[in-house]
Amino acid sequence: MSCADSIAKLLVDAHFSCYFSKVCPSALDCAEPIVVVEGAFSRDSRLAEEERGSVVVTVLVVREVMADAESVALAAELAVRRADWEPYADAGSCRIVGIDTAAPAFKERDSSGRYVWAFDVTCMVVRSL
């Protein structure tokens, strides 16, 4: 399990029941997905048994209508920000100890003409060595 998987599980539990994946699917496969993409681990400090750092996870909300993309992105960011993280803290080789979210913003229109809104979730993590 990864930080992206933890965030996707949280969103599913918050009733955002769209398609989650690491790449944006074709409009034929899923017309209005929420895509969760994980960035690389960035180490802040290293201790004898563990290292601490951060992982940025980008949440992309894809919708046919601009207003829908915006409202779902705002609701998803709010759900992530207000969530009790304890049930979702275990992310496989690392543990999420805190999160910070950025405000959702319009990103682009994809090749199918759908509107994409995005927000970043910075996960502060501890991972064992």
Predicted regions span which residues?
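Bilobed periplasmic-binding protein/Venus flytrap-like ligand-binding cleft at the lobe interface
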Residues: 75-80
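Residue-level signal for secondary-structure boundary sites
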Residues: 45, 67, 127-129
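Oligomerization/assembly interface segments of phage tail-like spikes and tubes
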Residues: 51-69, 74, 115-125
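Small/polar-rich, solvent-exposed N-terminal microdomains that initiate assembly or binding
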Residues: 1-49, 71, 83-94
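Acidic-leaning, charged glycine-interspersed low-complexity segments
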Residues: 81-128
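Short, solvent-exposed beta-strand/turn "edge" segments of beta-rich domains on protein surfaces
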Residues: 46-52, 109-112
